[in-house]
Swiss-Prot record:
This is UDP-3-O-acyl-N-acetylglucosamine deacetylase. GO terms for molecular function: metal ion binding; UDP-3-O-acyl-N-acetylglucosamine deacetylase activity. GO terms for biological process: lipid A biosynthetic process. It comes from the Bacteria. Belongs to the LpxC family. Keywords: Hydrolase, Lipid A biosynthesis, Lipid biosynthesis, Lipid metabolism, Metal-binding, Zinc. One of its GO terms (cellular component) is membrane. It catalyses: a UDP-3-O-[(3R)-3-hydroxyacyl]-N-acetyl-alpha-D-glucosamine + H2O = a UDP-3-O-[(3R)-3-hydroxyacyl]-alpha-D-glucosamine + acetate. It is an enzyme of class 3 (hydrolase). Gene3D superfamilies: lpxc deacetylase, domain 1 (3.30.230.20), lpxc deacetylase, domain 2 (3.30.1700.10).
Length: 288
């Protein structure tokens, strides 16, 4: 298999779920071995670019934020990163004229649609993978996330909320190709009781039923259209996991199991993997 990029640039407009600011985002083709690079076009400086790397993750409160050494940041990258992973885009330049990726409808589906509209181009370089060689695990009280050696990607994820609207949900997923059909349109979610507090902290400024699932104090989903899936909540947590793991720079080949995961946990797992060179190796498709 070869690396891929877009055939042509594609753009969208939208508001940030936390900043409430309207931004334009453009995904552009990039050369082989570039990876995913974000550029803040509203900042006229040669230091306005940030590599979408786990090492550059600076905040994981409610979303994933990346920053560079010059304190320039871009937040809520995970849904776009998941779409790039799900569409097998290895190399892209993301230009954005603000501090946060547009939330769109709260899922990855709009970004998948953009990529499909732009088209995909195969490049003259082998696709690379991160193959896990031994178990790597992160645990915090009853939350855990670990990966073990496998010949292909396989994920088993469980969430457990006290809210009866969500409860305990489990999902197993194995084929990257089915991400766009079965996971990409699962939306982010939140509790109405938390909204005022979050807004007082400068968060959730752009949140609405147009871009998130809202749950009230009676454990009722308030969105007029309801849920897209009975287990949409765990599907979205899986989407977040894929987006966060793609900050490794390449697709991970491993059996992954998680319970009550978070953006912080996802990032911690990558740091732990890369801290031990005996736990992984980089391979091409011919070496899988």
């Amino acid at each position: 298999m070869h690396q891929s990029t877009l055939l042509k640039p594609v753009s969208c407009y939208g508001i940030g779920v936390h900043t409430g600011k309207r931004t334009q985002l453009t995904i552009e083709p990039a050369k082989e071995n570039t990876g995913i690079i974000f550029i803040r076009t509203d900042i006229s400086s040669e230091n306005n670019y940030i590599e979408a790397s786990y090492c550059n993750v600076s905040d994981t409160l409610l979303s994933t934020t990346i920053s560079n050494n010059h304190k320039i940041q871009i937040s809520t990258i995970e849904h776009l990163m998941a779409a790039l992973w799900g569409c097998s885009i290895d190399n892209a330049i993301i230009k954005i004229d603000g501090p946060e990726v547009p939330i769109m409808d709260g899922s990855s589906k709009p970004f998948v649609f953009m990529i499909e509209c732009a088209g995909k181009k195969l490049q003259n370089a082998p696709k690379k993978y991160l193959k896990i060689l031994k178990e790597v695990k992160v645990v915090n009280k009853d939350c855990e996330l670990y990966c073990t050696p496998s010949e292909h990607m396989a994920v088993d994820l469980t969430i457990d909320f006290s809210s009866k609207a969500i409860g305990r949900q489990n999902l197993s997923f194995g084929m990257q190709e089915s991400f766009t059909k079965n996971i990409a349109d699962a939306r982010t979610f939140g509790f109405i009781r938390d909204v005022e507090y979050l807004k007082s902290k400068g968060l959730a400024q752009g949140a609405s039923f147009e871009n998130a699932i809202g749950i009230d104090e009676h454990d009722k989903v308030l969105n007029p259209s309801g849920l897209r899936y009975a287990d949409e909540f765990v599907r979205h947590k899986l989407l977040d996991l894929f987006g966060d793991l793609y900050t490794s720079g390449i697709s991970v080949v491993s059996a992954i199991k998680g319970y009550k995961t978070s953006h912080a946990f996802n990032n911690e797992l990558l740091h732990k993997i890369f801290s031990d060179t005996t736990s992984y190796k980089f391979v091409t498709s011919n070496e899988l």
